[in-house]
């Protein structure tokens, strides 16, 4: 995705997880804030940062520089825990924000209740990206374990999107087997035997599939799949929407301990609140996320989203239970995944 300048913000993309600095002259900025985000929000925040910087200067007479950092959500959370002084985080799942809160004490336990919709201004889901013509005939989750199918996906240990992938696959298998958890486990174990490359984040997985040409199918965020079509054209790829997926709810949160130390609370709070504004919700939908308030978005942007059955994290007991059961050290993912040799 390009590095062309935007109003108020010019983004320079570096290695995944490294800072992307947005400014038109840092020396001119009254305030600088850092948004630590996950892989799939790059184009979203490129435009949103520009819109917010323009509004902030118009409303206050002050300029603001917005820095962004992107990478696998779990890795990003670890960077903040290890001392990266984020003003806000916009991560892939609440378990990563909870991990920061527990490890640092810089976010209050009630952080989810401070913004609407449990602090999720947008949602997404998991879909399949296949090559043009769908040569392997992939229509649903059951097709992914057929002989010869090669899957590209990110790693649940480092990527939030990968954890949503895992749970969506589990939900389908559980439903297909009348709620049988053992059968669901068996299916997901078989699915991961078909994973050719397990990248650290969604961005890396997309690159492996789209640019390097590996694999028959990519398990990916819905917005990433649409971006691939936008950037590379529908002549190369197709989106397959499975019969069941999951409602992915990426949350946003203020890092109270950091903003109070840096004196940036006012601008950081305004930044997160602006995601819920009519402008913010339009930008969210434009970049293929499902806005919390779809009535504020352009109707043509909403119309492109497929109607599908989506389970929620509540069906797994919430993120705390899902993280413990599936993704923590010694959890089900560790038990079933055997890296290719």
Predicted regions and their residues:
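Extracellular/periplasmic juxtamembrane helices and adjacent flexible linkers that interface
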Residues: 259-341
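N-terminal segment of the mature folded domain
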Residues: 29-158, 302
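Short helix-loop capping/hinge motifs at secondary-structure junctions, enriched
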Residues: 133-139, 158, 171-179, 258-266
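Extracellular/periplasmic catalytic domains that process cell-envelope and extracellular macromolecules
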Residues: 82-83, 119-123, 132, 143-146, ...
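Periplasmic-binding protein-like
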Residues: 120-124, 185-192, 198-200, 232-265, ...
């Amino acid at each position: 995705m390009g590095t062309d300048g935007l109003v108020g913000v010019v983004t320079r993309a570096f290695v995944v997880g490294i800072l992307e600095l947005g400014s038109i002259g840092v020396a001119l900025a009254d305030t600088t804030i850092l948004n630590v985000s996950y892989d799939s929000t790059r184009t979203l925040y490129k435009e949103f940062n520009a819109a917010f910087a323009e509004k902030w200067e118009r409303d206050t007479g002050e300029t603001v520089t917005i820095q962004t950092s992107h990478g696998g959500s779990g890795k990003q959370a670890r960077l903040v825990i290890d001392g990266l002084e984020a003003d806000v985080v916009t991560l892939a799942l609440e378990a990563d924000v909870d991990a920061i809160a527990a490890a640092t004490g810089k976010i209050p336990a009630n952080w989810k209740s401070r913004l609407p919709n449990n602090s999720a201004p947008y949602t997404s889901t998991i879909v399949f990206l296949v090559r043009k013509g769908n040569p392997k005939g992939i229509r649903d989750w059951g097709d992914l374990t057929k002989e010869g199918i090669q899957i590209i996906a990110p790693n649940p240990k480092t990527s939030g999107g990968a954890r949503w992938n895992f749970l969506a696959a589990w939900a389908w298998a559980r439903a297909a087997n009348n709620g049988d958890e053992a059968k669901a486990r068996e299916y997901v174990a078989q699915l991961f035997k078909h994973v050719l490359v397990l990248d650290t984040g969604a961005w890396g997985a997309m690159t492996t599939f789209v640019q390097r040409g590996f694999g028959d199918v990519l398990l990916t965020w819905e917005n990433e799949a649409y971006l691939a079509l936008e950037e590379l054209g529908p002549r190369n790829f197709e989106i397959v929407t499975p019969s069941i997926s999951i409602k992915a709810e990426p949350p946003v949160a203020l890092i109270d301990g950091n903003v109070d130390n840096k004196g940036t609370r006012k601008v950081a709070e305004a930044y997160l609140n602006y995601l819920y504004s009519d402008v913010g919700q339009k930008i969210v939908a434009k970049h293929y996320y499902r806005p919390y308030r779809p009535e504020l978005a352009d109707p043509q942007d909403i119309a492109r989203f497929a109607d599908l059955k989506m389970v929620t994290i509540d069906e797994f007991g919430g993120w705390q239970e899902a993280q413990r059961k599936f993704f923590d050290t010694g959890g089900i993912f560790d038990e079933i995944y055997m890296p290719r040799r």
